[in-house]
Amino acid sequence: MKKIILIIFISINFISISFAKIVEEVKKVPVTVTNANGVSDSREIVVTIWREDSRVKSPYLFFNHGRQSHPALRKQFDRVRYSAQSKYWVQQGFVVIIPTRVGYGESGVDIDPEDSGSCKTISDFPGQVMPQVQQTKQVLEFALKQLTYVDTTQGILVGQSYGGLGAIKIASIADEIKGLKGVVNFSGGGHGRPTQLGQFGAGTSCDSKGLEKIFAEWSKNKVPTLWFYSSNDKFFGPSDPKDWHASFKNAGGTGEFINMPEWRNDGHGTIGDIPNWKPHFDKFLKITGVPFKEIAPPESIKTKPTGFARLDDISKVPSLGSNVNNQERRDRLEDMYKKFLLFPDPTNRAFLLHSSGSYWYWWGGVDAVQEVIDKCLAKYDTGCKLYAVNSDVVW
């Protein structure tokens, strides 16, 4: 049977989606991590699984997320889903496995085993990525033993940002990871400084030379690697990643560097640019020998201004469902919309209303529009409608 995922966008931006062939599951997996100082901790972490509902045995795609160093931001860390990418990879034939690691969101923030210190301290990148490596091994061991629909003989590991840094480390010990055939690094690195000015400047790592050294040390990769970086990466800039890859290659590493086009206002989220990385990703899969289905990438959700209202005219935000004739709920809706207007990045934010009166907003990350749509569709099958995207009302 041909497996499809159908997305229909009606002209007025109401969204109806059928995910009958794609299943999202949440598992709790016990892990033990040891940080760079030798301190150990054992607990359960949240793991998201994306798969086809037919439970056909499929190769795995293991995904490691990036990092937030501030405790408040780590606490706010949602369960990691990467829904647009995950659904695409499931369509390609993978079971997608995404742990939310110790130190983040639902997996517990009372400790931070990946603490990399400040720019004033000496970086210990090997010690700091070890908790990521440990959890990768343990979660994958769980998946290969407990999930009967996972092909234990072949899989790919993908990492984004700090997860990309760890991915290159894992490539150097791939013989310890069952079935691992290739590693993909999206925007990998550490100690990025997207907004701070000073000695190192904004948009660079404050330990770029340290990363050059460590990538050289990890160059004895046992499987092929693929590196994606965008020219407008606000964490690492356009030149540092090229130096890291050159250091890796000069020390004997094998892997292709893809210089991605600019991605919105911050190329650190270039993993969201599926149409542009897809050809390189597919070519890489052929090199690894892992079987996959060649399919078209999902189209970006397109929106356009409607002239319904000015963006800052809060009075025009519609009251729907339970918000009608309920001043208390109307006040809460307006308060949330005010927060949306205050978001610092006007090029990647979205506000969505549901016909029941529920609402969602999001800013930053890979794709704010996709995030609010996913949040709505996780609760409702229909009735989700975008109100504002970036600096425009699209209602």
Q: Where are the model-predicted features located?
A:
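The feature captures the conserved acid-bearing segment of alpha/beta-hydrolase catalytic domains
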Residues: 182, 188-251
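N-terminal cap/lid segment of alpha/beta-hydrolase-fold proteins
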Residues: 21-55
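Alpha/beta-hydrolase active-site loop
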Residues: 114-148
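The conserved beta1-alpha1 loop
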Residues: 64-66, 229
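Secreted/extracellular ectodomain signature
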Residues: 297-395
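Short substrate-entry loop that stabilizes the transition state in hydrolases
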Residues: 56-58, 66-108, 235
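C-terminal catalytic histidine-bearing segment of alpha/beta-hydrolase fold enzymes
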Residues: 250-306
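Primarily recognizes the serine-hydrolase "nucleophile elbow" in alpha/beta-hydrolase
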Residues: 137-209
